[in-house]
Amino acid sequence: MSGTRKPGQRATPAATPGGMQLFDRDGSRKYLTVAERARFLRTAEQAPREARTLCMTLAWSGCRLSEALALTADRVDLAGGVLVFATLKKRQDGIYRAVPVPPSLLEALDLVHGIREAQRRRGRGSAARLWPWSRMTGWRAVHAVMVAAGLSGPAASPKGLRHAFGVAAVSSGIPLNMVQKWLGHAQLSTTAIYANAVGAEEQDIARKMW
């Protein structure tokens, strides 16, 4: 098997042992770049309130769409500055992880979903889901913002936001074991795929000088 690529073809990082790749078979990215992620968040500011907070949660926490849709008020730690997600791909139930998020996200969640009020009631609404939507409804809300932001392709999806979080974290120098914890990966080798994507991003930046 030759390592030679056709002119203009992007280098595709190797897959993890579990098969995860950040490029599809055509070499298209499955993750948003830093600029695309920022554009998505700016566009989300104009979306309906519940769609906006869902988009912000996905972008700033790196969680899976199903994990975001399972989030309840009692798992929003305003004092600690974290969101607590049930890690849905673990083999056993009851596995949670705390992910630090920006104050702006916590403020938006409180404003739109009444987090403080729900937590004060304790048991009378604090366990209700913030977004009582099906997975398809949540996906459509995110997709609508992607379209409005002019984003398309495999990266323009909730999974693309999750991958963008991983790439941004590694690019910022966050240790891989910390990124693994935040993303809820069972194996560090899965998280390590984002280091390959950083290399591809650096190549794109360098190409601007050539």
Regions found by a protein language model. Give the residues of each.
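Short, charged phosphate-coordinating catalytic segments
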Residues: 58-80, 177-178
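Short, basic (Lys/Arg/His-rich) helix/loop patches that form interaction surfaces
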Residues: 42-47, 120-126, 140-181
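Basic, Lys/Arg- and aromatic-enriched nucleic-acid-binding interface segment
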Residues: 34-65, 123
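C-terminal catalytic core of Y-nucleophile DNA break-rejoin enzymes
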Residues: 26, 90-111, 122-144
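Catalytic-site neighborhood detector that most strongly recognizes the C-terminal catalytic loop/helix
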Residues: 87-91, 183, 187-208
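Flexible interdomain linker/hinge and immediately adjacent N-terminus
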Residues: 1-39, 86, 92
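Conserved tyrosine-mediated DNA breakage-rejoining catalytic core shared by Y-recombinases
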Residues: 1-2, 10, 34, 70-111, ...
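DNA/chromatin major-groove-contacting recognition/catalytic segments
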Residues: 14-17, 97-100, 196-210
